[in-house]
């Protein structure tokens, strides 16, 4: 199975953000994003348990090497990977069949091991929240979908 997985660092893109955001009512392709709302963003910021996490060059390299290590250990193939300052995109091929597909396993493994390695490096404290809850896990069911996701990950990212 091929998946397009995205996950964000903690506190860097809250509901209400001027860029728009996704929630349960605004999470389908083609639907409007959650509208910017300064009051909602301020409220979400007040609920934060730790400061926002930004990935500098050293942290980005740590996350990238860790995701590649996890994929190798699991027997997965990474087809595209981009670690940015506030989120991670990865197109990964697992050994799952459609009947037992669980993209959340890949998402959770990537986040857990990246967190562990960042903490081991001394880059983040043990108390810091590192990633936002969950993330995006999209099934890629055709070669065209895989190619499109890889193109997006590798060629369509701004810092």
PLM segments and residue spans:
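Short catalytic/metal-binding and nucleic-acid-binding patches
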Residues: 1-159
């Amino acid at each position: 199975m091929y998946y397009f997985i995205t996950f964000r660092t903690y506190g860097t893109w809250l509901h209400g953000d001027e860029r728009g955001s996704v929630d349960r009512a605004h999470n389908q392709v083609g639907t409007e994003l959650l509208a910017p709302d300064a009051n909602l963003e301020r409220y979400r910021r007040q609920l934060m348990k730790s400061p926002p996490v930004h990935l500098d060059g050293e942290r980005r390299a740590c996350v990238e090497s860790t995701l590649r290590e996890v994929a190798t250990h699991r027997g997965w193939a990474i087809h595209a990977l981009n670690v940015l300052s506030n989120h991670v995109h990865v197109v990964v091929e697992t050994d799952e069949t459609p009947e037992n597909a669980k993209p959340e396993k890949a998402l959770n493994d990537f986040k857990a091991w990246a967190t562990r390695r960042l903490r081991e490096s001394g880059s983040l404290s043990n108390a810091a929240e590192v990633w936002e809850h969950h993330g995006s896990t999209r099934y890629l069911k055709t070669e065209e979908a895989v190619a499109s996701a890889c193109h997006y990950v590798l060629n369509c990212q701004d810092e």
